[in-house]
């Protein structure tokens, strides 16, 4: 669970959905009928966890569904996703929100392509007083990947 607080601290400007160890176990290890591959990127000498990835193989590609870790280890995670996909002779694809797409491209500028999708993310907010203001503070700041949906 050390990676989740590190991730929250390194992206303070974003709203992040829950990515604790218990959530990952529920989301990726306890879902019947779907095989996910969970990778843990470690520091070579100490074995300290740097980042974790959730991947899913398809016949023509490898989906990178989730990332857990601080921003500074994103380049290591990208390299791990590419190495895993290469072993299975597939390209890597990832859905990421616009808020973090530039972070992924900056972490590994060679060979990454970013293109907008037409996916709309409906959000709303309620508190004890009822609906909040029409301008939501998280607009443009949601840290999302494909694994944050129920259909991947």
Where is each model-derived feature located?
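Active-site/acyl-donor-binding loops of N-acyltransferases
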Residues: 27, 45, 52-152
